[in-house]
Amino acid sequence: KIGMKIKSFLIASLAAFSLTAGAQSLSPSTKWHWDKGTIVVDTPERPAGQENVLGLKAPKLQTVRVGFVGLGMRGPWAVMRFCHIPGVEIVALCDYEEARAEKSQEYLRKQGLKPADIYSGAKGYEELCKRKDIDLVYIAADWNHHFPVAKMAMENGKHTAIEVPSAMNLEQCWSLIDLSEKTRQHCFILENCCYDYYEMNALAMAQDGVFGNIIRAEGAYIHCLEDFWNAYWQDPNDNDKDNLHWRMKYNMENRGDVYPTHGLGPVAQCLNIHRGDRFTTLVAMDTESFVGKDWVSKKSGKECKEFRNG
């Protein structure tokens, strides 16, 4: 009996990446124009002979060999979960800081599992992705590394699973789709809010017809991050106290919904998006930033004049 199949991770289609754009920016090379107050983005032309991956099925695997990249805040929890999934072998652990990878290694030892190989440094993920004995690369690194790690993984014949937001602009979204189509490798957005008990229950009810013909839906994600700001404030390994943690820096410099798929993903599943229907227009709104400014002012003892998100 096969304990686990690769497709059991990879239920959602790659097209969900098009939803991540709400939080990120249009890259300079993205072609777009205004149409009655709406930003209209041109859809890249699919190369001749290349097919979409909405129905892509990977060959069944007796054992899924996994490499993890990014073991800071979210990555270690993923390693812990995978330790308890039958049919999984954790082959490699990678983080810029070797000590973080070693912490996850210690968890493997406590579970009586075979030690994984450790990779670290700026190019460690490249070495991991080039291995021949990895089927899936699980990416929980900082956001700016989501795309380059996924690109390296797929170019080396690996399926990829990427934390939100997965891409930082529309060009990267389309590039991930193109890479998945060319390599025929799954590229899965780890949108955890699609798979909580409440959302899965609602999806089952929708598919069973409990709500009838769904013609309108609302979704939301409300999460005050104030409890995390201390952790996001400063890189503990940086002696320059003016250098902020990448997560805090991003919120200070960028507006928008950072990961719209938290609220929109479950709704998209209930509406069967990309299974007959698709989104044509997305609307994003925000308020004036005041909570973030107040927090930074109190933390730093200096007035914060610029905090764009929140």
Predicted features, each with a name:
Residues 183-188, 193-310:
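Predominantly a Rossmann-like dinucleotide-binding segment in NAD(P)-dependent oxidoreductases
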Residues 136, 142-143, 147-195, 209:
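Beta-strand-loop-alpha-helix segment that lines the small-molecule cofactor/substrate pocket
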Residues 21-25:
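Boundary at the C-terminal end of the N-terminal hydrophobic targeting segment
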Residues 92, 136, 216:
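Short, Asp-centered acidic motifs that coordinate Mg2+ and/or phosphate
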Residues 2-10:
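Bacterial N-terminal signal peptides that target proteins for export
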